[in-house]
């Protein structure tokens, strides 16, 4: 008996010695070993200036040969991106949110992620069959609480490869199956063209895209339809307006696309409290290439159907992507979002001021205007600063606004793609500063042909 007690006491003492040794070494003498090469490689690529008109990346073309080449911004060329091409066509079509890149350059240390070669090799987290990071789910709930743009209490959260995959999962979950009549998908004009493109591409017997929600409401065709799915995009893409549902009734289901409902783009007027809401990292932090989004879902049956869709189509979202999203969102909420949201809002506010000044001198083109509203996040009345300018060609002869701008070497997106009139064109304002500067230069030249002086802008 005494012998056993001595063995137990000896074991406890030995464990204490080992524990103290480990803690002492970890806090006093530990130094990085295997991360050195990765850190040096990342910093070496980031240190290449590319004349301020491009970027060098760890995975850039030529790195396998030991080169760190520059990837130049549009309209710049040369080995170091120092050559500006004359009369280069401007790309105002893409929704790449590169306007936030300067913020993340400032936050290089806080936002950096280094992972081991054996990081999350399993299909699931913790061996419990879960495809989602519990910590990432926690921080998403904190983010919405900080911003005040969505209710997360009593909501399930599901991750997807951007809002694009989540949209498909949502439509699948809400569509009727084994019905003689397919569910109808509607939204308000102008609408994000992906809604129609996805419905047409998947060509499901359970779903049919019907276009404008208001037109559908007035139509006699809706009398015998058992289920309608309305997508409510707020703020709306392309015109930036806050939207509410058009349809009502027991046979209507809703998908609320809140990808742009962040203080950069819109006043936060209320906490969204919906059955199914979609968000994306792309428009939250600017990291479109990470392909990460999430849905807030009230009903468990809908959540389960969406979870099955995500599981069967991709077995969840990349674990590496989830790690990066976690680190980025930790930076965002570190100061309550104050720094990034003020930076993003300030950048877009300045861009809109320049744009409004140019178009105010034109009678040929007009911009969509939205009345300022009180923002619960910034605690003040503020203007809308949407991602895109929704431009109308006012002259009767200018029937195709997209082609009018394209002839002036500005490529936007045709209004017809949004279910609207061809007299409209969408111009992106969220790309890099170089892209915006080139857009403004071309717009000045274009508007100046109306014999109005714009050089002072």
Swiss-Prot record:
<dbReference type="GO" id="GO:0016020">
    <property type="term" value="C:membrane"/>
</dbReference>
<feature type="binding site">
    <location>
        <position position="237"/>
    </location>
    <ligand>
        <name>pyridoxal 5'-phosphate</name>
    </ligand>
</feature>
<dbReference type="InterPro" id="IPR015422">
    <property type="entry name" value="PyrdxlP-dep_Trfase_small"/>
</dbReference>
<comment type="function">
    <text>Probable aminotransferase.</text>
</comment>
<dbReference type="InterPro" id="IPR006947">
    <property type="entry name" value="EGF_alliinase"/>
</dbReference>
<keyword id="KW-1133">Transmembrane helix</keyword>
<keyword id="KW-0812">Transmembrane</keyword>
<keyword id="KW-0472">Membrane</keyword>
<dbReference type="GO" id="GO:0016846">
    <property type="term" value="F:carbon-sulfur lyase activity"/>
</dbReference>
<dbReference type="GO" id="GO:0008483">
    <property type="term" value="F:transaminase activity"/>
</dbReference>
<dbReference type="Pfam" id="PF04863">
    <property type="entry name" value="EGF_alliinase"/>
</dbReference>
<feature type="transmembrane region" description="Helical">
    <location>
        <begin position="6"/>
        <end position="26"/>
    </location>
</feature>
<protein>
    <recommendedName>
        <fullName>Tryptophan aminotransferase-related protein 3</fullName>
        <ecNumber>2.6.1.-</ecNumber>
    </recommendedName>
</protein>
<keyword id="KW-0808">Transferase</keyword>
<dbReference type="InterPro" id="IPR006948">
    <property type="entry name" value="Alliinase_C"/>
</dbReference>
<dbReference type="Pfam" id="PF04864">
    <property type="entry name" value="Alliinase_C"/>
</dbReference>
<comment type="similarity">
    <text>Belongs to the alliinase family.</text>
</comment>
<keyword id="KW-0032">Aminotransferase</keyword>
<dbReference type="InterPro" id="IPR037029">
    <property type="entry name" value="Alliinase_N_sf"/>
</dbReference>
<feature type="binding site">
    <location>
        <position position="291"/>
    </location>
    <ligand>
        <name>pyridoxal 5'-phosphate</name>
    </ligand>
</feature>
<feature type="binding site">
    <location>
        <begin position="163"/>
        <end position="164"/>
    </location>
    <ligand>
        <name>pyridoxal 5'-phosphate</name>
    </ligand>
</feature>
<feature type="binding site">
    <location>
        <begin position="280"/>
        <end position="283"/>
    </location>
    <ligand>
        <name>pyridoxal 5'-phosphate</name>
    </ligand>
</feature>
<dbReference type="InterPro" id="IPR050478">
    <property type="entry name" value="Ethylene_sulfur-biosynth"/>
</dbReference>
<dbReference type="InterPro" id="IPR015424">
    <property type="entry name" value="PyrdxlP-dep_Trfase"/>
</dbReference>
<feature type="modified residue" description="N6-(pyridoxal phosphate)lysine">
    <location>
        <position position="283"/>
    </location>
</feature>
<keyword id="KW-0663">Pyridoxal phosphate</keyword>
<dbReference type="InterPro" id="IPR015421">
    <property type="entry name" value="PyrdxlP-dep_Trfase_major"/>
</dbReference>
<feature type="binding site">
    <location>
        <begin position="257"/>
        <end position="260"/>
    </location>
    <ligand>
        <name>pyridoxal 5'-phosphate</name>
    </ligand>
</feature>
<feature type="binding site">
    <location>
        <position position="123"/>
    </location>
    <ligand>
        <name>pyridoxal 5'-phosphate</name>
    </ligand>
</feature>
């Amino acid at each position: 008996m005494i012998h056993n007690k001595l063995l137990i006491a000896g074991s406890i003492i030995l464990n204490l010695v080992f524990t103290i040794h480990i803690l002492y070494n970890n806090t006093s003498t530990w130094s990085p070993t295997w991360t050195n090469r990765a850190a040096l490689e990342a910093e070496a690529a980031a240190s290449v200036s590319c004349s301020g008109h491009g970027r060098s990346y760890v995975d850039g073309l030529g790195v396998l040969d030991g080169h760190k080449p520059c990837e130049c911004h549009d309209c710049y060329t040369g080995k170091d991106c120092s050559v500006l091409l004359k009369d280069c066509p401007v790309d105002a079509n893409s929704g790449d949110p590169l306007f936030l890149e300067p913020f993340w350059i400032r936050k290089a240390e806080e936002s950096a992620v280094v992972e081991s070669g054996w990081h999350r090799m399993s299909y699931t987290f913790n061996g419990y069959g879960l495809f989602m990071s519990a910590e990432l789910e926690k921080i998403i709930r904190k983010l919405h609480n900080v911003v005040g743009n969505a209710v997360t209490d009593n909501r399930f959260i599901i991750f997807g490869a951007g809002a694009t995959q989540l949209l498909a999962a949502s439509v699948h979950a809400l569509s009727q199956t084994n019905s003689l009549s397919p569910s109808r998908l509607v939204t308000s004009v102008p609408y994000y063209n992906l809604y129609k493109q996805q419905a047409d591409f998947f060509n499901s017997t359970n779903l049919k895209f019907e276009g404008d929600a208001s037109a559908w409401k007035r139509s006699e065709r809706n009398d015998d339809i058992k289920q309608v799915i309305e997508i409510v995009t707020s703020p709306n893409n392309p015109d930036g307006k806050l939207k509410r549902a058009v349809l009502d009734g027991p046979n209507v289901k809703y998908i609320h696309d809140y990808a742009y409902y962040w203080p950069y783009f819109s006043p936060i007027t209320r906490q969204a409290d919906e059955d199914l809401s979609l968000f994306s990292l792309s428009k939250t932090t600017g990291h479109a290439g990470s392909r990460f989004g999430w849905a807030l879902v009230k009903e468990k049956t809908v959540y389960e159907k969406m979870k099955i869709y995500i599981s069967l189509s991709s077995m969840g979202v990349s674990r590496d992507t989830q790690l990066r999203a976690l680190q980025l969102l930790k930076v965002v909420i570190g100061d309550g979002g104050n720094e990034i949201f003020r930076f993003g809002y300030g950048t877009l506010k300045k861009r809109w001021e320049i744009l409004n000044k140019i178009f105010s001198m034109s009678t040929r083109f007009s911009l969509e205007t939205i009345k300022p509203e009180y923002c619960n996040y910034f605690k003040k009345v503020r203007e809308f600063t949407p991602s895109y300018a929704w431009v109308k060609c006012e002259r009767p002869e200018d029937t195709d606004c997209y082609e009018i701008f394209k002839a002036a070497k500005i490529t936007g997106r045709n209004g017809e793609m949004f279910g609207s009139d061809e007299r409209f064109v969408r111009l992106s304002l969220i790309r890099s500063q170089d892209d915006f500067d080139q857009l403004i230069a071309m717009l000045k030249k274009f508007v100046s042909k109306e014999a109005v002086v714009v050089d002072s802008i």
